[in-house]
Amino acid sequence: MAQVAKKILVTCALPYANGSIHLGHMLEHIQADIWVRFQRMRGNQVHFICADDAHGTPIMLKAQQMGIEPEQMIAEMSQEHQQDFAGFAISYDNYHSTHSDENRELSSLIYGRLKANGYIKNRTISQLYDPEKGMFLPDRFVKGTCPKCKAPEQYGDNCEVCGATYSPTELIDPKSAVSGATPVMRESEHFFFDLPAFSDMLQAWTRSGALQEQVANKMQEWFDSGLQQWDITRDAPYFGFEVPDAPGKYFYVWLDAPIGYMGAFKNLCDKRGDLDFDEFWGKDAKTDLYHFIGKDIVYFHSLFWPAMLEGSNFRKPTNLFVHGYVTVNGAKMSKSRGTFIKAGTYLKYLDADCLRYYYAAKLSSRIDDIDLNLEDFVQRVNADIVNKVVNLASRNAGFINKRFAGQLADQLADPVLYKTFTDAATSIADAYNNRESGKAIREIMALADVANRYVDEQAPWVVAKQEGRDADLHAICSMGINLFRVLMTYLKPVLPSLTERTEAFLNTELTWDSIEQPLLGHSITAFKALFNRIDLDKVNEMVASSKEDMAPATRVTGPLADDPIQETISFDDFAKVDMRIALIQQAEFVEGSDKLLKLTLELGGETRQIFSGIRSAYPDPKALEGRMTVMVANLAPRKMRFGVSEGMVMAAGPGGSDIFLLSPDSGAQPGMQVK
């Protein structure tokens, strides 16, 4: 009995329309595209959509800095984004914008239903206000000194040095990041979405299979701490949709951003005329809805979004597929090192299929981070795609074209071996379907090794020189071409450009259901180079170009310029600080935090536990173990969400991945005082 085709709607998280797409973004779009292409190969009806997230204060301010209207900026950015995604062969059916008529109508509809159902609450709040710009300031547009560790130049929501979270009103000496003015407190009435009203529904949905176990466990922490009402409005000036019947109030960007999924699909429905919007978004929809997202936006997609849909009588997602971050060469992407690589820059130097393959080989259904090690990237692509797969075709095609007029043999040389290859279709399909592309790639490459071993053992280059063995040569090389065809069919979701060239060479379409029947008596075309080996020099040029792309303007920079020396203190004040040499006995990740490491320090007879916001700079915490450092030993213990921190390690640098732990000279011992 034939399997009934599924109707599936797939989305990727909406890129923010104030910057270029980079290789971190591309992980998600490539992962989703591989899954979509596989589903289409299996006969399912898939609609794949995305859009630019085009609202919010950052876009409004950046457009002002550029001297243009926000509408012009987001239009130009949308064109750039779509060009980048096309360059990576991301097969979107529609790419739209949240700044659209469809999104405005749907946002107003959902808000109206939530309000009518009693889920919108009004409350007066106090906010920081920029008196020079005449605007309320979002958390990230306020900077000041951390109220916990006293680190300067920290954002209004959390400290990148000690990891503390707080409200912008707690900052010491806060300044507007927009004008530099000292903000003042002002009151404003805001509208809130009553998220706690959906707690029971969300807890049931969490454990329904809609989320990966890691995500469901994280959500349980949020439930345990209690859900809070969500502020869904912002005050003018703001670039976005004005709230109906509330002049001067605008929907917060995170309200209309996920509704952008619906708006993009509605736009596709209107374009085509053969799609039913309600079939995919109606309360009782039987179709499948999947969101591919990064772990940084799980909170919005696993709490607010399903609650908004439930409260406005729309369906909830079938699944959220969450992935981790991308690091490059074991560290956070860096503009100064040239590893913050834009998608457009990559495409100037390298084939998109190379990155698609490398990401596919590393991806799984878990939310682990993926490291793009550039040397390994070159070696793996060259070894797997060029040496194992494409080489299989080139080793056999020449003989078929020259000796047999491009026609394959009428029979298979080794039907048993061929069946081994086609039998693997089930397990490879399961891996793709479960988003275990790394597992699929490993199985495909194992088959490629078998195919090349067959050719090595049969040695067609030797047989070709032996008189009277034309039939053997024909059979061997035809077998090699047929094995190549099976491998490329399995790789089709990953390598669309190579697939297109392969189909032209084999003179046939690669389909999952056709591999059971080998190509017998079939004519192929003249072989042309299908794939070029990656040149490490090209990778180095790409990195160098990324440094130039991200180079700052002519402003003078440096440690003192970026972080001026603070006010003079007395010697007595300094003498109160007790700094000691410490041995890092153990370093480990802190579950639930993307910024902190937990350090166990030995002070020569005393052990301390410290939480330090250095994870981005030290992605492999084990590398710190056994190292000497300097700590503030008499800092009052501070209770954090993850435990008690008993001091502070000393480090230099601006923050993020550019943090450098201090180390003493040789001879210093744990417990020694730094004087």
Swiss-Prot record:
Coiled-coil region(s): none
UniProt-recorded Gene Ontology molecular function terms: ATP binding; metal ion binding; methionine-tRNA ligase activity; tRNA binding
Residues binding Zn(2+), per UniProt: 146, 149, 159, 162
GO biological process, one term: methionyl-tRNA aminoacylation
CDD domains: Anticodon_Ia_Met (cd07957), MetRS_core (cd00814), tRNA_bind_EcMetRS_like (cd02800)
Main location: cytoplasm
Motif ('KMSKS' region): 332-336
Protein residues bound to ATP: 335
Catalytic activity annotation: tRNA(Met) + L-methionine + ATP = L-methionyl-tRNA(Met) + AMP + diphosphate
Compartments where found: Cytoplasm
Keyword Lipoprotein on entry: no
Keyword Oxidoreductase: no
A GO CC term assigned to this protein in UniProt: cytosol
Bound cofactor: record note: Binds 1 zinc ion per subunit.
Location of the motif 'HIGH' region: 15-25
Pfam short name (any one): Anticodon_3
Complex formation: Homodimer.
Protein name per UniProt: Methionine--tRNA ligase
Organism, scientific name: Yersinia pseudotuberculosis serotype IB (strain PB1/+)
Gene responsible for this protein: metG
